[in-house]
């Protein structure tokens, strides 16, 4: 009887999640919209007229663009200048590929420029969603504010976060995450995608199932967070869930 109940609950969970995924695919936004903006507008404008619009920045030598997202007053996206679909791309594990997370952290300055006053680093976070957890098929890192409750959890767990991957104490937004402390120096020279693929067992073979997030800690280091798709736990590996595009932290004062 107990086994039958567990099977029934599992089937209901799978059905609910399948319905959610099907809805996303049956009623999608254009999954190539970001790629069209980058390839058909930002890059030609920069090359022909030195005008990156609608992007805020096009850095051809470094291989990235920065675009203001339509959601939230301060959210920006960092994207490559060539075709990379997302976190599952083998290109992200090549030594020849730029360190997009480090570039995105440098690009946080656009948040302050848009706001007209400094956005403290403690309010900033970076995320990239998994293959199933995203709506766009052009690689993009979300540069946006951190949720206040997530900021509080990171502060409380700071001393428990080590330099090796380990489960984050408790959960974040109801989902399990791995956490790893990263220094600024390490972040500048080593891609978080490499850290995940080389240090978490079997991650290299299943990169598309993972979502990554990065946020600063109070002691000057960073915490790198990773969550893996778990359908029975309603987790699509959408670490953007840790962000608050309305930036309540800034309304509450300097975090």
From Swiss-Prot:
Keywords: Cell inner membrane, Cell membrane, Hydrolase, Lipid biosynthesis, Lipid metabolism, Membrane, Phospholipid biosynthesis, Phospholipid metabolism, Transmembrane, Transmembrane helix. It is a single-pass membrane protein. Its EC number is 3.6.1.26. The keyword Cell membrane applies. It catalyses: a CDP-1,2-diacyl-sn-glycerol + H2O = a 1,2-diacyl-sn-glycero-3-phosphate + CMP + 2 H(+). GO terms for biological process: CDP-diacylglycerol catabolic process; phospholipid biosynthetic process. GO terms for cellular component: plasma membrane. Pathway: Phospholipid metabolism; CDP-diacylglycerol degradation; phosphatidate from CDP-diacylglycerol: step 1/1. It is found in: Cell inner membrane. One of its GO terms (molecular function) is CDP-diacylglycerol diphosphatase activity. HAMAP family: Cdh. NCBIfam families: PRK05471.1-5. This is CDP-diacylglycerol pyrophosphatase. It comes from Cronobacter sakazakii (strain ATCC BAA-894) (Enterobacter sakazakii). The gene is cdh.
């Amino acid at each position: 009887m107990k086994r039958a109940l567990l099977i029934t609950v599992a089937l209901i969970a799978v059905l609910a999640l399948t319905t959610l995924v099907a809805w996303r695919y049956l009623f999608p936004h254009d999954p190539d919209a970001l790629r069209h903006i980058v390839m058909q507008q930002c890059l030609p404008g920069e090359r022909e007229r030195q005008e990156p619009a609608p992007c805020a920045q096009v850095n051809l030598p470094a291989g990235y663009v920065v675009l203001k997202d339509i959601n939230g007053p301060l959210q920006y996206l960092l994207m490559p200048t060539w075709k990379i679909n997302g976190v599952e791309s083998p290109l992200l594990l090549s030594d020849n590929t730029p360190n997009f997370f480090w570039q995105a952290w440098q690009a946080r300055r656009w948040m302050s420029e848009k706001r007209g006053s400094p956005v403290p680093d403690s309010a900033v976070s970076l995320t990239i969603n998994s293959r199933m957890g995203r709506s766009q098929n052009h690689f993009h890192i979300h540069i946006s504010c951190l949720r206040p409750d997530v900021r509080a959890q990171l502060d409380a767990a700071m001393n428990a976060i080590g330099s090796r991957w380990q489960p984050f104490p408790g959960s974040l937004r109801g989902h399990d995450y791995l956490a790893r402390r990263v220094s600024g120096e390490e972040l500048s020279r080593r891609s978080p995608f490499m850290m995940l693929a080389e240090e978490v067992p079997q991650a290299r073979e299943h990169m598309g199932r993972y979502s990554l997030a990065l946020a600063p800690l109070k002691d000057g280091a960073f915490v790198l967070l990773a969550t893996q798709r778990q359908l029975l736990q309603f987790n699509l590996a959408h670490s953007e869930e840790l962000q608050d595009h309305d930036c309540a932290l800034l309304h509450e004062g300097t975090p």
